[in-house]
Amino acid sequence: MKVCKLIYQKKSCLLGLSITKLISGLFFILFVSACGGISKPNITRNPVAHNPSSQSFRDATDLLPFEKFAIAQANFLLANQDSSSDLAILNKSKSKLSILLNQGRKGFLKKIPAGQWTQNNKEKIKFFATADLNNDGGDDLILILGASENPKMQILFNNKKGYFYPKEVGKYSLIPGIEKVIPVDLDGDGDRDLFYFGNMLKASTKKYRQTMVWINKGDGNFENLTSLLMPALPAGIRDASFADYDGDGVKDIFLVYEKGQNKLLINNGVGKFSDRTSSSLPRILDDSMHADWADFDRDGDNDILIVNRSIHKKYRRYSGETNYFLENKGGGNFRKRSNKILPRFPSQKVYLFDGNGNNHPDALILTAKGVYYFKGYGKWQFSDETIRRLPRFKKFDEIIFGDINQDKFLDLFGWSRQASRLWVNRFD
């Protein structure tokens, strides 16, 4: 799932286990989101709520050391040696990256610089992601620097005290047009690799792959294996969702395209991808914005929920249809599944997670009219719980998830141009 959200593990994560065992095992991902640039909560067990019907999000913005702060991007991370979710924030001008350390009930410490390198940096930080790249237990920073004509990757490693520093090998050149990066294990060796993409990559070769894949050698050093691992792709990539879609135990890629056909790339087991779009996806032309995955019908196959600005009327099942599911019929073969409960107006983000601890995926959808919360009951059944479950403020551009109070349930931080909010998941 594209944002790291709480949802029962899919068989892509634990091979050879039944759904029942999955439900009692690990309980964390990652949509949404995550899809691109996603915050990964570090949940180590599956929490099952005693009273799921009592769940709601409560505003806890007063735990933050600021009332108003213009935010370009944020991610939860493990910045120090405790297990609480800390917060990394990039300011609106994209010039300063700050770390807010979580002090539990005392709230977050006042913003501190991410390190000497970030203080001395003169280039704009176009985008950043967080992940443990060298397997030392602390999340590192992956930055995209500079203008789109000449982007660069800079990796800053964490000393596990919230201080981030570069290594000599931590800076790499990127293809012009690169905009985002998602840390994900593509070759199945347990290390986070880096998947880069953009809306329009200006490659120097005739094969426009529109992505870059940097494989982690195991110690936080990377090798560019794009030409070996990725097929040629058309321009227009907006986002990507990683999950085991064909049931072989390794992560595949669902690419979200603007104004065109979305793409499905299947992993051969060692990180080489082939385009299976024509044989495995229904033809649907739409203006897609985001996608996330979950096993909605609990048949062991990962399904997809796609949100869009619009769908070409030829592919709508009912008037006003804007968002839809792709139901996995097995082996990574999908069919469109409509559901009239989904919002019928332009939507920009979707996050799938088990918000109320009943072992069914719920959905948060960011739309032109605000945030919607859909409670899942399984077998494609949902109810609109927006008014009951969410605080009044419901206008976000993006959301990230983390465990603020270490209760094993996901809390969230959301922001827009107008404001930001911290919501804590409660059961009372």
Residue ranges and their predicted role:
Residues 83-87, 137-143, 190-196, 249-253, ...:
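Glycine-aliphatic tripeptides that mark coil-to-beta-strand junctions in extracellular
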Residues 37-70, 87, 101-123, 157-176, ...:
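Blade-edge motifs of beta-propeller repeat domains
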Residues 33-34:
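C-terminal motif of bacterial Sec signal peptides marking the signal peptidase cleavage site
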Residues 70-81, 124-135, 170, 177-188, ...:
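Beta-propeller blade termini
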Residues 398-428:
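Blade-level signature of beta-propeller repeat domains, shared across WD40, Kelch, NHL, RCC1
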Residues 64-95:
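Beta-strand-rich domains and repeat architectures in extracellular enzymes and scaffolds
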Residues 92-95, 146-151, 203-209, 258-260, ...:
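Short, solvent-exposed loop/turn segments at conserved positions within beta-propeller repeat blades
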Residues 89-91, 143-146, 196-200, 255-257, ...:
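Recurrent small/Gly-Pro-centered beta-turn motifs in extracellular repeat architectures
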